[in-house]
Amino acid sequence: MKKMIDNSSLKLLAMLAMLIDHIAWVSFPLATNMNILSPNWLANSMHIIGRLAFPVFAFCIAEGYRHSHDVSKYMRRLGLLALISIIPFSLMGWVTGLGFIMQNTVVTLFLGLCALYYSDQQTATWRKVLIILLCFTLSIIADGGLTGGVFGIYAFAKIKDPIFRKIGGVLALNSVQILILAFNFSYDGLVDLAATCLLFLLVTSFYNGQKGANIGKVFYWFYPLHLLALSLFRIAFLLFLM
């Protein structure tokens, strides 16, 4: 099978998936408020596509860590992006947890990168584990809910075999959801989990390990600007309905 997707292409696919998901989150609640019939199948389909975004971004963060010549600079950029994105993310109406203090997905990606970097500075296993658990705890606050993002990023970076890296990483990424399903099973939850894992594994099966074009700045601008544009659209519609 020819592997034609490089790292830059993966990021672009993840950005597109994220945009589709966020458009669904903004558009369908507005349609409901305007008493317009909302086709649930379309909203659900858009959200399923959107499920691809976070695992791919997590995978790319791990790849960036493994191949970066200046990890501290990489961390500063991602941390700055997380801070810049706080306001547009909050304007989207997705404020939970500690609200404007953190509250966006990039924080979880940043914490996953921190877990990798700072745990690798330690020699004692207990210190490594403590750092990873601390970053995981902070990610719960950042996302306003339980997520295994930090575990997934760590697994993507540390598992040696390329195939097991993807499988182990996406399972670690969804470890909390798997644990919840084990104790509180739901068919919808299982379908959502399976769709996320299978879609990620399908797309990354075409990954060739190459860096590709330098689009770092595209992602750093895209994330806050697309949130800002969608939040302004949402606010304008809500004002129109008043």
Regions found by a protein language model. Give the residues of each.
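Alpha-helical transmembrane segments and their immediate juxtamembrane cytosolic regions
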Residues: M1-M242
